[in-house]
Amino acid sequence: MAKSWGETTGGSNDKIEFLKFNNGITRVRIVSGVLPRYVYWLTNKEGSVAPFECLRFNRDKESFVRGKADPVHELGFFEKELDKDGNRVPLKPKKNYIAFVIDRSDNKLKVMEVKATILKGIQSIMKQLNLATPFDIDISIEKKGKGFDTEYDVQQIAAMQFQIKLQDPNSAESKQYAADVDLIGEAMCDEDGDIIKFEKVPSLEQTYPVPTYEEQKEAIQAFMEGRENKDDDAKSGNSNAGSQKGIDQEAASDLDD
């Protein structure tokens, strides 16, 4: 299940885009919990890159299950670099925690990769502002550099300033949040008044179901042979995430280990 923002350690949804971080400031409103997962990035003969969820990773416990069957390893995918003894190393999965957000550049619902530094930054803001969730503030994230030198900075002062402006019912921020209801629906709260979810925001678990071993193996083989079909996203663990398959190499390379 999707984890709440405090506890994790680390509309129509027919087409859900992945948020692309460009150098500079990206501003988002988070509208879901965070879904823990690890993925393998595979490249087929046509040069296309696609993520396949690591079936050895337990989402709920946020840990790897030793000895669990893994079609990526069985099919013989390896790292490009050899180990210090000159031996081939089985391909390693990359952390790919995700959450639904509203991208303020176009006010569309998208999926954001919650990188380790972003997660820590958001949790720090929640602590500073005494928030149970980050749903009631916009988050500004600054990206610097590229590739393995990429850095992400969650701007705490901007979040504090936004929270103050949101208290004014006549502010642009308050009017934007009122308009967000058309996209995400009403907030659904628990008995303490804390937001659990938004009415129209789809379930991360249902959007990104964990495939069976057989389903994923077939999806990998189809992708590598260039014969993937419309069902392969679900079998790989990336239902409705076709746009992620076109993710650029830089975005893939700066994922967390």
Swiss-Prot record:
It comes from the Viruses. Residues 222-257 are annotated as: Disordered. Induction: Expressed in the early phase of the viral replicative cycle. The keyword Transferase does not apply. Residues 225-235 have a biased composition (Basic and acidic residues). One of its GO terms (molecular function) is DNA binding. GO terms for biological process: DNA replication; viral DNA genome replication. Keywords: DNA replication, DNA-binding, Early protein, Viral DNA replication. Required during DNA replication. Displaced viral DNA strands are transiently coated with the ssDNA-binding protein. It is then probably removed by the replisome that performs lagging strand synthesis or during the events that lead up to the recombination process. This is Probable ssDNA-binding protein. It comes from Escherichia phage T5 (Enterobacteria phage T5).
